[in-house]
From Swiss-Prot:
Alphabetical GO biological process terms: methylation; rRNA processing
Assembly and interaction partners: Monomer.
Active site (catalytic residues): K300
Catalytic activity from the UniProt record: cytidine(2498) in 23S rRNA + S-adenosyl-L-methionine = 2'-O-methylcytidine(2498) in 23S rRNA + S-adenosyl-L-homocysteine + H(+)
Identification of the protein by name: Ribosomal RNA large subunit methyltransferase M
């Protein structure tokens, strides 16, 4: 189990390689990263026994930016028939697991394998339980089987509390029919990723106040209104009429970069299409000056050196807050609903 498999958005394999290689170097885990363009995954091949396990134990998956999911393990070739027997034999050297996910890569080939995985899961689960390789009442790791085809699978494991919240890191969020744009799912996914579900009722409570910069037509505003948060929607464009009729939205026709609330708010959110450095500076200002307690801001990415640029901007935000003497948690993730962008979350401590 000396290979670390990392899922990602197609086209961002290079960013995953750069990110995991940097962490491995810091942790002194020898190895190398490799990936094929648009394959929706990357691999880190460890040069020493136990390297992949050390990486996963020393890193928090939630702190990684570009990987959607990860697992340590090995590739296994499967026959056309009796795949289960071959899998069971291979798993003899693996720990007993407490959950099972069958995964595919986020490619056209991967999507075509989804039906196979759905049909294969029930008989496989039954066989694993019968063979004592799966104990769903136990405390073992999660068994993650990533199928590249019906004949090739990556047999991996990961701790359930240190890996993706959803299979392949892809959330199953339903688009709310009342929301004025599909961008609404970005903010909902961000909340799932950055805020533990048990804290939603206190950190996203009814009666709180929020500002949505670049709000029109109101996709992100809708998420706050849906939780009965009072919103100042800032945009020169028109807002959705139903949102305005909710009584929870005040529309300010103003520039999102110059707008300031009359008093501090609980939340600031921003999905303005602008140079990432400008959005990062806006984020630092709002948290640094105490204009809000928490913020979610999207940073659009350049065409090249994307990981290096994100890292530079996060360091600039951290340095700026340190100079102000402000303590804050800083999180960053390329969410499933993000495209050429990442989502940053800051919380003033």
């Amino acid at each position: 189990m000396n290979t670390l498999l990392l899922h990602c958005r197609p086209g961002f394999e290079g960013e995953v390689c750069a990110e995991i290689s940097e962490h491995a170097a810091i942790l002194e885990v020898a190895g190398y990263a490799k990936a094929r363009p648009d394959s929706a995954c990357a691999e880190f091949i460890c040069s020493e026994p136990g390297g992949a396990e050390r990486l996963m134990r020393r890193l928090r998956f939630a702190d990684l930016i570009f990987p959607r999911q990860w697992a340590r393990g090995d590739y296994l070739q499967l026959p056309e028939t009796d795949r289960i027997s071959v899998l069971l034999a291979h798993l003899a050297d693996y720990p007993v697991c407490s959950s099972l996910w069958l995964e595919v890569l986020d490619t056209n080939d991967g999507k075509e394998l989804s039906n196979f995985c759905r049909k294969f899961e029930a008989p496989l689960r039954k066989a694993l339980v019968k063979a004592g390789r799966l104990d769903e009442q136990g405390k073992g790791p999660r068994l993650l089987l990533t199928f590249k085809s019906g004949r090739e699978v990556f047999v991996g494991i990961a701790e359930a509390n240190n890996s993706a919240l959803w299979p392949m890191g892809i959330p199953r969020l339903k688009f709310p029919r009342q929301a004025p744009s599909r961008s609404t799912l970005k903010l909902e996914e961000a909340w799932h990723h950055f805020i533990p579900r048990e804290q939603w009722d206190t950190r996203l409570a009814a009666g709180m106040t929020g500002v949505d910069l670049g709000a029109a037509p109101g996709g992100w505003t809708w998420q706050m209104v849906n939780r009965h948060i009072k919103v100042s929607a800032v945009d020169n464009g028109p807002m959705n009429a139903d949102l305005m009729d909710s009584g929870l939205v005040e529309h300010f026709r103003a520039d999102g970069f110059t707008f300031r609330p009359k008093r501090p708010v609980d939340w600031m959110v921003c999905d303005i299409v602008e140079k990432p450095a400008r959005n990062a500076a806006l984020l630092e200002t709002w948290i640094g000056e105490g204009l809000c307690r928490e913020a979610v801001v999207n940073l659009k990415l350049p065409m090249k050196q994307r990981y290096a640029e994100v890292k530079r901007l996060l360091e600039r935000i951290a340095d700026g807050l340190a100079e102000r003497g402000v303590k804050a948690s800083i999180g960053c993730k390329q969410l499933y609903h993000d495209r050429e962008e990442v989502t940053c979350h800051l919380r003033r401590l």
